[in-house]
C-alpha cells in the first residue's frame, strides 16, 4: 500500500509518501505529487507529529521509519546526514572527509536526498559556511536553519 499526505507547514506544503516499510519521499509540494490519501496511516501520523514538533522549534526525539532507495554511496551519505545534530551544520568538505570522498560526490548524493527535513540536508553548507543549493529552495533552507538557530 502507498500512502500519501500533504502537510501544511510554515514554509509551504510538504508532500509525504510512505509504503508499508516506511517513508519513500518527503518533498516540498512544488516538487511532489499532490495527493491527500490515508492521513491516518501510522507512518504519516508519526511524521505529522515530528513536523509539528520541528516547526514549533522543538527537537524531535523520534523519527519515522524510512524506506530509502539509492546507491550504496547515497545511503552512506544519507546516514551521515542523519548524524548531524539539530542546531549544527557541517560543510560538504567536512562530510566528504568523514566518508573519504570528494565534496562533489557528496554534493551529488545530498542533492538526491528523497526525505527532506527528516534527513537534514539543509544542515550542509558550502565552504566557509556559505549558503548553497537545496532542492526545497534557498529561502526555505535559510528559514530551516533559522528554526534551528544555525547562524550563517
Per-region residue spans from a language model:
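Basic nucleic-acid-binding alpha-helical/helix-turn surface characteristic of O6-alkylguanine DNA
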Residues: 1-101, 151-152
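Structural signal for hydrophobic
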Residues: 81, 121-122, 144
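Residue-level detection of the helix-turn-helix DNA-binding "recognition helix"
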Residues: 111
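Ligand-binding loop in jelly-roll beta-barrel domains
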Residues: 114
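Short Lys/Arg-enriched helix C-cap and helix-to-coil transition segments
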Residues: 117-127
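…primarily DNA-binding HTH/wHTH and HhH modules…
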Residues: 129-152
